From Swiss-Prot:
Belongs to the ScpA family. InterPro entries: ScpA, ScpA-like_C. Component of a cohesin-like complex composed of ScpA, ScpB and the Smc homodimer, in which ScpA and ScpB bind to the head domain of Smc. The presence of the three proteins is required for the association of the complex with DNA. It is found in: Cytoplasm. This is Segregation and condensation protein A. It holds the Pfam family SMC_ScpA. GO terms for biological process: cell division; chromosome segregation; DNA replication. Participates in chromosomal partition during cell division. May act via the formation of a condensin-like complex containing Smc and ScpB that pull DNA away from mid-cell into both cell halves. Keywords: Cell cycle, Cell division, Chromosome partition, Cytoplasm. It comes from Bacillus cereus (strain ATCC 10987 / NRS 248). The keyword Isomerase does not apply.
Length: 247
């Protein structure tokens, strides 16, 4: 099975790091590099397993994190001072911390500008202009509160749960299901369930190939705005609703 899925909601490695900092309530001024590196690499590994189009920037950041981690493990000596004569030891995390703080400010400003734009749009009665032809790139983004990083975390949890339950002697029979067919199956399943269902209940089959196809089908349905993903709080169960049900 080969299915490359590129989604603009992946804004870059700094966005993923901020997501991890928020998700695990990490102090941005005192980042536990070992833990954040492990989580980051886990996400990147899952993205590659799902054959998502992982930009090279993610791999560069992975190398940077590993380098910082190795520096943090080195013994500190009094002679390890900065070239400018300062009498303190340079923190290997300093540059990354500054980049994250700047990026966080940028994200906040961008969010505020978007909210103001939406407020202004509500003040006008003029029919909206069709910019469809100019929005080819924007069509791949996911206009949802639940991010793709949340979805990846849920998929990781699901894979761990399935692996724990699976008997060692189970024989895997390879099956290939088209993404489009699985999308149709999910929509029918939601209709039977009254328009809303737990994300985990979509994965009734333990075969890895089918689980991957199901996850990619969910992403495609999200992109097409045929389903909505809901999560009350961080780490809560994720629910999938048909778009008509949530409207």
């Amino acid at each position: 099975m080969q299915y490359n899925f590129k989604v603009e909601a992946f804004e870059g490695p700094l966005d993923l790091l901020l997501h991890l900092i928020h998700r695990y309530e990490i102090d941005i001024y005192n980042i536990p590099v070992a833990e954040i590196t492990e989580q980051y690499l886990s996400y990147v590994h899952t993205m590659k397993e799902l054959q998502l189009d992982v930009a090279s920037e993610y791999l560069v950041m992975a190398a940077t994190l590993l380098q910082i981690k190795s520096k943090m493990l080195l013994p500190k000596h009094e002679e390890d001072v900065l070239d400018n004569g300062d009498d303190f030891i340079d923190d290997p995390r300093q540059e990354l911390m500054e980049r994250l703080i700047e990026y966080k400010k940028y994200k906040q400003v961008a969010t505020e500008l978007k909210e103001r734009e939406q407020e202004r749009a509500q003040l006008y009665t003029r029919p909206p202009i069709d910019f469809t032809s100019l929005q080819q790139e924007e069509e791949t983004s996911l206009p949802l509160d639940v991010t793709l990083y949340d979805m990846l975390a849920a998929f990781q949890k699901l894979m761990r749960r399935k692996k724990a339950k699976k008997p060692v002697t189970t024989r895997i029979t390879r099956q290939e299901i088209p993404i489009e067919q699985r999308m149709t199956d999910i929509l029918k399943q939601l209709e039977i369930q009254g328009g809303r269902q737990s994300f985990y209940d979509l994965f009734v089959d333990d075969e890895r190939e089918i689980m991957v196809v199901t996850f990619l089908a969910v992403l495609e349905l999200m992109k097409n705005q045929q389903i909505v993903i809901e999560q009350e709080h961080n780490f809560d169960e994720i629910f999938v609703s048909s778009y008509t049900k949530s409207a």
